Amino acid sequence: MNTMKRMDCRDLNQSELTQHCAELGLPKFRGRQVFQWVQQKAVQNWEELKNIGAGDRQKLQDGLFLQPLRKVREQISQDGTRKFLFRCADGETLECVLMDYDRRKNRDRHTVCVSTQIGCAVGCAFCATGLGGWRRNLSPGEILGQVLDITYLMRQEDPDFQVTNIVFMGMGEPLLNYEAVLKAIELLNDPEGQGIGMRRMTISTSGVAPKIRQLAKDNPQVGLAVSLHSAHNTTRDQLIPMNRKYPLEELMEACRDYTTLTNRRITFEIALISGQATLEAAQAVGHLLKRQLAHVNLIPVNPVAGTGMARPTAKEVQQFAQCLESMGIPVSVREEKGTDIDAACGQLRRQLECEQK
């Protein structure tokens, strides 16, 4: 009697798949074949593995899950941004976003913003995800599955479609699901899978200081973005409750350690909120970052029902940016994508939950 635990094949790297295939009584080379079908070609069921016989496919089906995320809803913005609401095997829903950017160096840039948790425990004041609380962590297969299933859907329209960049900026705090996120990155980077370069992937964190240091040691090639939002602990406590555990002094020390170990610049994200995007706030950010290898990305906040926060004026955004530039801080204003479809994380999922109540 076979008592071996049935595993999600999307969770497994080539070595693990090879071992699992051997345990199923299959030739070891099947592991590489299965990995390529699942991770590179983003197949949705075992019948699509055309170079594997029916008998071996049945063994794979008996010993491994191949269960794609199910698309529940899709919204398409006027700028081409697509927002997907997917349902997991246990019925939970998650969001991810596909953003297309201008052609550069003769190649299209297709960026997927992925979620790492169902809900979020951090509870940032301007984020829709945290309004419903934290449910659970996503598995490596569920994290990278967002990329695979978007790839599969888009290849119905363009057979040559390929995701080029990943940002871990969707639902959840990536560094609170650390092991699963790093495993997903490993799988996405594999040249026989999606083959996405480490430097084309960026993790965004609310400021989990110990994990920032650990990331510098475990994977120094992946980009890091820190949700800063304020240079004052009192304000940041209100915007990002994580600050009460890891206040600015501890966070910035971890960031300095990160740049010392990796020699890589950190992107500091600042959500600009009407009434708070002041010159005084900009000057405080400039002073905080003056000795840090940093780039500031300004994000005019998306209005979210239930937060009471409004967007700043274009003049407020411009003055904030100019102030930082005058202090020698590199700064950019995020190119907005999908504003007409509520593309910020958590909004589509929250909309569905409100409809079902």
UniProtKB/Swiss-Prot annotation:
InterPro entries xref list: Aldolase_TIM, Methyltransferase_A, RlmN_N, RNA_MTrfase_RlmN, rRNA_lsu_MTrfase_RlmN/Cfr, rSAM
GO biological process, one term: rRNA base methylation
Cofactor info, note text: Binds 1 [4Fe-4S] cluster. The cluster is coordinated with 3 cysteines and an exchangeable S-adenosyl-L-methionine.
Disulfides per UniProt: 113-345
Reaction(s) the record says it catalyses: adenosine(2503) in 23S rRNA + 2 reduced [2Fe-2S]-[ferredoxin] + 2 S-adenosyl-L-methionine = 2-methyladenosine(2503) in 23S rRNA + 5'-deoxyadenosine + L-methionine + 2 oxidized [2Fe-2S]-[ferredoxin] + S-adenosyl-L-homocysteine; adenosine(37) in tRNA + 2 reduced [2Fe-2S]-[ferredoxin] + 2 S-adenosyl-L-methionine = 2-methyladenosine(37) in tRNA + 5'-deoxyadenosine + L-methionine + 2 oxidized [2Fe-2S]-[ferredoxin] + S-adenosyl-L-homocysteine
UniProt keywords, alphabetically: 4Fe-4S, Cytoplasm, Disulfide bond, Iron, Iron-sulfur, Metal-binding, Methyltransferase, rRNA processing, S-adenosyl-L-methionine, Transferase, tRNA processing
EC number annotated for this UniProt entry: 2.1.1.192
Residues engaged in binding S-adenosyl-L-methionine: 172-173, 204, 227-229, 302
Binding site residues for [4Fe-4S] cluster: 120, 124, 127
Primary residence: cytoplasm
Residues of the active site: 95 (proton acceptor), 345 (s-methylcysteine intermediate)
GO cellular component: cytoplasm
Domain Radical SAM core: 106-340
Class of the enzyme per the UniProt entry, highest EC level: transferase
Domain of life per record: Bacteria
A Pfam cross-reference name: RlmN_N
Cofactor: [4Fe-4S] cluster
Subcellular location: Cytoplasm
GO MF annotation list: 4 iron, 4 sulfur cluster binding; metal ion binding; rRNA (adenine(2503)-C2-)-methyltransferase activity; rRNA binding; tRNA (adenine(37)-C2)-methyltransferase activity; tRNA binding
Family (UniProt): Belongs to the radical SAM superfamily. RlmN family.
Function: Specifically methylates position 2 of adenine 2503 in 23S rRNA and position 2 of adenine 37 in tRNAs.
Other facts noted in the record for this chain: Reaction proceeds by a ping-pong mechanism involving intermediate methylation of a conserved cysteine residue.
Identification of the protein by name: Probable dual-specificity RNA methyltransferase RlmN
Organism: Desulfitobacterium hafniense (strain Y51)
Gene name of this polypeptide: rlmN
